[in-house]
């Protein structure tokens, strides 16, 4: 395998609206991000994945784009963006842009023209039909919206203000590639591609994901834009299997660097149930099975894994699968150690490195997320009690990840001196960056150490993965390269568990516990986690 910079990189996702406000309007912005680059450099990350900062009406927090080559005024200016890229480069931190090309905003110039003039070439940039079929929007209800002006329906797989683009139109595709090259020329480090598996859809057959033209489009995109550049490209692919992931990320196919698979995230939901029916506890044996499949079936010559627990669409991992009460710090460290020592490129979501938690939403008035609000109204109409809906939003709602970054214990957690666009989690007095940096035993320093290990130890990129037999609630695996083996053991529970057999420890690489005591007792205390080099 030809090694690229992203094989031993660690990526940090910034949700700009909630990261750091520099002008006291209560909304995070580009200057705010630039002001915190020294903090991210201290953490040790290689690149920032920046959620969308393009011009947008903000119906879906920037994933509804009205101009791909301009910056939303709430985030700043193009000069601010160029400064962020330049200041990042000074610290060896690349900026990865969020590429949202399944849909635009209905306020994009293309859609405005398509709507106003049915004879315009831009009309075919979108998907219009005389009658709707059965496609359901990801945000509830029909995915078809009637347009009074032209008497046709347009497709929107998300909000009705996010009309889907028609990738069958060659002129549209080349306009998108021109836009990508505009950003590449600005010096960005790559693209995270939003719901990229949907661009090959066949609406008339109700095929939304993984359509037959998906991979030809990606090959064409690769050749027209980033293919000859040293950029990271990662696709969001909810339905991917290892075999599908190989199609995207096998270097021979000349498509993407890697994809985000969500099979492990599916364990947050009850089997066979829609998203809002969350699972009461983690099925650890199933988690072991899923990760082992991806670690062993997506070989390094055939593709590459993305490793993540959190993003802007998911609840906080320490609240979902950790224990955000008695064992918040220890369980956050355990989950980090488990993930970061696997094979692949790890992604950290802002606040994960200090153990930020879900928000205690009390009423629908606290909620900003369009997906949660739409679901709540639909569920109320079906007679679901409000207290059940609020419980679901507290566990699964996307706003859990979007509360402002907690920088210190001052008003509004140091995020803003204004009124924040979304309420700060009330636990910011205890959980914040300033406190984490002052505590040598904080979660932050575990993440910092894991990132340093990845930079120092080539085996983290190249060594094979082997699952180790252990108790149901214990996830243990080896990374093996030639005669050398490294053992990772994590107790994913708040109860004591039996330690799997460990033969001959040469060195402790990282731990959230006293490994010598664990080895002597043969017992793992709640949330014990460590990695050792075996003799």
Question: What role is predicted for each listed range?
Answer:
Residues 496-514:
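Beta-strand-rich binding/interaction modules
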Residues 5-6, 225, 232, 239, ...:
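Loop/helix patches that line or flank the sugar-binding groove of alpha-linked glycan CAZymes
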Residues 56-57, 103-105, 198-203, 240-245, ...:
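Flexible loop/turn segments at secondary-structure boundaries
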Residues 2-177, 181, 185, 196-251, ...:
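Acidic/aromatic-lined carbohydrate-recognition and catalytic surfaces
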